[in-house]
Amino acid sequence: MKKKALLLGAILAVSSSAYAKEVLPAVEEVQETVIIAEVTPEPLIKSVTVGQSLEVDNTSGKKNIGEDVIFMNTAELSTENWDYTIGAGKVFSSDTHSREGGLYDRGTSRMELQAIRNFDNWFLGIKVQSNDDYDRWYLRTGYDYGMFSGWMDAQYYSQEKNNEDYGRIEIMPFNVTFGPIKVGYYLDYKDYTGKGQVMDNGVLEKSADHQLRAYAPLYNGEKLDLSLEYRLGLHNSMDYSNLKKDEGYRVYKDFNYNAMIINANYALNDSFDIYGYYRYDISKFEAKDGTITNEDNGKYYGEFQIGWAYTF
């Protein structure tokens, strides 16, 4: 009996050992190959653009070439989130009938500095424009969510001589884009410090200009792009004090200011662009708080600019 029990125990032990060998898999060593990819860091400076521009502004009845001729040299530097601009140039007037005998006067110098911080759908920046007779300080912001966009320039003019300082806000708070066309409301508001700016007919304290503006592309080619901007004056107002007796002031009649601007850009290659625009305004004025004798003076206004830009 004992022999049978020993024999049975031996058989069970051998069977358990054989079963364990069948169930437990053999462990194999696996060698992993790790590939380290070299990551190239993003460049700190994305692009550098240099260029020059010439702008000629003129109102009917004034200089026969340009009451303001603006020549600027500019350099722009862009990083991942920042855009920096520096500009230097000259502002003068030009007339073939100049009393001084030349085609242009000595004019004034101009310097501009700007820094813009770009976020996902909006931006915030500052700009300083320094001229011989005034300085102009900007706080700039704007947003763009595709169909809806807007911008604002809050400005302060620090003037010399007998000119009063004033604050100015230019704003398009809400623009709507329908396909290729964008439409929005524009406000230009000025508020003079102190008692206001002394004019020939009184003291100007405030002014406001309300417009409707529309933008549309005209042509988009391989090298040439053309676009159009239209401005309709809705209402123009001015606040005067101490108006001289029987002397009024003028504003354009409601819906009687029209401006058309054609913008053009021609890409000679991937780096070099030639650009420009032409603007023409037609206004119909009316007298307020008195009579005026110069209603039609300055009813036409034009601007022309041409420039080039090279991007490294």
Place the predicted regions along the sequence by residue.
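Cleavable N-terminal export/targeting peptides
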Residues: M1-G51, W82-T85
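Outer membrane beta-barrel transmembrane domains
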Residues: S109-M111, F123, H210-N294
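Outer-membrane beta-barrel "beta-signal"
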Residues: Y266, D296-F312
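Transmembrane beta-barrel strands of outer-membrane/channel proteins
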Residues: V50-V56, I86-K90, I126-S130, Y143, ...
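Repeated loop/turn-to-beta-strand initiation elements of outer-membrane beta-barrel proteins
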Residues: N81-I86, N118-G125, G146-M152, N175-Y185, ...
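Residues that define the transmembrane beta-barrel architecture of outer-membrane proteins
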Residues: I65-F71, D105-M111, D133-W137, N163-I169, ...
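Outer-membrane beta-barrel architecture
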Residues: M72-E76, E112-I116, R140-G142, E170-N175, ...
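Detector for outer-membrane/organellar transmembrane beta-barrel domains
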Residues: F148-Y249
